[in-house]
């Protein structure tokens, strides 16, 4: 599943569970579907879904406001609605930016406590 520009699908997630966990393909598919359904159900109820070291999915209410049609410039009322928001954890942000949890770039060695400088 690694790579740039690739979209990961349910099938990809099921295959990863199959390869890494050892469940059958049918069980892997059922497992992924169950997890996604549970997340969806929680969000539908307005609950926040917090996944440690990954991030939080939450539902926010947006009030009614006036928007503008970009083609005509006409003002258009936008109805109140709920939107889903994802807030990544600090750990996920660091990993995406190629950093380890200690703030170092991946591949950089951490300074040794016992290194001595000679002049």
Curated annotation (Swiss-Prot):
Residues 96-119 are annotated as: Disordered. SMART domains: BHL. Keywords: DNA recombination, DNA-binding, Transcription, Transcription regulation, Translation regulation. GO terms for cellular component: cytosol. One of its GO terms (biological process) is regulation of DNA-templated transcription. PROSITE patterns: HISTONE_LIKE. It comes from the Bacteria. It holds the Pfam family Bac_DNA_binding. GO terms for molecular function: DNA binding; structural constituent of chromatin. Belongs to the bacterial histone-like protein family. This protein is one of the two subunits of integration host factor, a specific DNA-binding protein that functions in genetic recombination as well as in transcriptional and translational control. Heterodimer of an alpha and a beta chain. This is Integration host factor subunit alpha. It comes from Bradyrhizobium sp. (strain ORS 278). The lineage of its organism: Bacteria, Pseudomonadati, Pseudomonadota, Alphaproteobacteria, Hyphomicrobiales. The gene is ihfA.
């Amino acid at each position: 599943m690694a790579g740039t520009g690739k979209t990961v699908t349910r099938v990809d997630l099921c295959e990863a569970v199959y390869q890494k966990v050892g469940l059958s393909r049918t069980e892997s598919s059922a497992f992924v579907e169950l997890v996604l359904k549970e997340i969806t159900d929680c969000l539908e109820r307005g609950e926040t879904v917090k996944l440690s070291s990954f991030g939080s999915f939450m539902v926010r209410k947006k009030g009614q406001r006036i928007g503008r049609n970009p083609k005509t410039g006409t003002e258009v009322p936008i109805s109140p609605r709920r939107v889903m928001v994802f807030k990544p954890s600090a750990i996920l942000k660091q990993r995406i930016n190629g950093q380890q949890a200690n703030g170092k770039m991946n591949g950089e060695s951490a300074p040794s406590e016992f290194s001595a400088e000679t002049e």
